Amino acid sequence: MKNIDEKIKKIVALIDGAATEGEARAASLALQRLLVANNLKLEDINLDDSPAEVGEEACDLGRRIPEWKKTLALVVAANYRCRAYTSYSNNGRTVVFVGEGEDSVVASCCFRASANAAENCFRTYCARMKALGYGNVSRQKGVKGTWMLGFISSLKRAYAEQVSNDESMALAIVVPESVNRHMDGIGLRTTKIKVRTTSDPYVKADGYESGYGFGRGDRVTAASA
């Protein structure tokens, strides 16, 4: 059990300190696989035997939260036994992950890694389009939102494929009732996420391709070794 604990801790460290987008995504997928293979939850690696408590982990997003980041937060949270909500104050905007034990911390790490990867890939896309003579596409209405939705959609597909390959994982990532009760107690106001988009299908397709390549990182096995 000690060796498994150490592996899990190493993977969590990889997620938060990954040098590249591929390493971060591969590590997060490796974490899911290792937990399921050993019939474990993240709280099982705690040093004490006390019941896992529901905690919150906030990510500071500055003065504004792009709508696509709200969508990304929900996708990541659902796949790490968490719920997520956005918080607004005079000091800035945050997305908050709610989960048992270390779940919220891991979800937060994966969210930051995925958001950074998406931003980097979008900049690469914009540079490529400019080199092809299409100008500064990042300033064109709806382009970034559409591209990001494609990226997020493919990440969601990567999660779904991993679950479909191992039926036990479907149970492993179910959000605990304690987390749902915590969210109910907060009494949040429900708002609809509105991402500004464009009708150009090629923009979303490019985002999807980039996100899928990121989501299916080829270093999963190495990260879990």
Where are these regions (language model features)?
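Long alpha-helical, hydrophobic tracts
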Residues: M1-V54
